[in-house]
Amino acid sequence: MSNVNRRNLLVAAGASSLVAACGGGGGGGGYSGGGGGSSSSSSSSSSSSSSVTLPDPSTAPALKNHFAANFKIGMAVDPGIASEAIANAILLKHVNSITAESVMKANPIGVSEGVYDFSQADTLVAFAQANSIEIRGHALNWYQTSPAWFFAGDQTDMTAYKALVRGRLETYVTDVVNHFKGKVYAWDVVNEVTSDDGSATYRNSQWYQIFGPDFIDYAFNAAHAADPTVSLFINEYGTEEAGKRGRFLTILDGMIARGVPVSGVGHQMHINTGFPAASDVDAALTAVEARGLINHITEMDVSLYNDPGSCYSGTGCLPEATGATLATALHAQALKYREPYAVYVAHASVKSVTTWGVADNHTWLDSFPVVRKNHPLLFDEAGNPKSAFWAIVDPTFVVP
């Protein structure tokens, strides 16, 4: 998401200016059930982000097995990262779903009208298939990665222009879905269509300016026609924030009323150590369930930095966490990870949970909203399970 969009959302949500600090003990939601894995065997794990004593990494349960009764476990990755030693070992042990972080978006695939480059996406699919990992497709329509050729043309006659652009969208969606037919179990069809501004419902993207909400219908209908068996999702960030969730549900209700073939909602869940509360996550999932749809968590990470809203316009950002501040932030992060995972397990409608990355050595949050080291994932820079990992797999684990 763009800096300004993220900033506006967090301002609306009342983001704090401090890294959240949590008291001792396990805290948080926890859950019972799920797969195996014991935390009884402990050793001093070497970690690039922490020096606390954690269970022996060799005792870590495979996440895909631990949560097998609940949902798929996924991670976002591109081919270059998937082949690196740290990421490769984690992926092969822990996941049964991967999302293409960038190589299935329209700007790398849609070279020009009718000309496609599937090479990188095909490489990722081949890796997944060779290792019995399923693929989530991401994303067929996103305003930030729509090539300019979609919108080229004479706008003097808007009826003809709209027909031209609609045809390009439908052809692109059809061709891409057909290319990956039988290889992708779910598609994020449209991504981030909800306004962050409370005075509007829809994001004022170029797609919306041309078509209003109709472009959503065109994309979904084309995807469903190309592959009636694949699950189709609308993907959004900020569904855990009440105001934006209300606007998003207005969009979703309109889609349902119009008969758009939507299977479920992708909740990005880019959160931080101070926001949201478990009740906010529960409200988002419950609202989707009430509409008869399924839930996927599509891009989860937990930033160490509970920045003020002004940080997203470049001022007031917290300094890079080191030493005792880092230890405090990692403690808070583990407790924050535990809370939503307990909520996910409590909702049978949650069918897939994906983190936006594999380990802390590669994360978009190292450069967003400013350049500083972040540690937002379940595995540290060396690929070892962090406190956050143990917090979600063991409800008795006392977060150090």
Residues covered by each model-derived region:
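C-terminal motif of bacterial Sec signal peptides marking the signal peptidase cleavage site
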Residues: 20-21
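Ser/Thr/Gly/Pro-rich low-complexity, disordered linker/stalk segments of secreted
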Residues: 24-53
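Glycoside hydrolase catalytic-domain groove-lining segments
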Residues: 213-218, 227-231, 246-250, 254-317, ...
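Acidic-and-aromatic substrate-binding clefts and catalytic sites of carbohydrate-active enzymes
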Residues: 76-86, 107-119, 194-196, 238-248, ...
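Aromatic-rich peripheral "rim/lid" segments of glycoside hydrolase catalytic domains that contact
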Residues: 179, 193-209, 222, 280-287, ...
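Substrate-binding cleft and catalytic face of glycoside hydrolase catalytic domains
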Residues: 97-111, 120-232, 237-239, 307
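Boundary/entry segment of secreted carbohydrate-active catalytic domains
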Residues: 52-90, 94, 101
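N-terminal secretory signal peptides and thylakoid transit peptides that target proteins
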Residues: 1-17
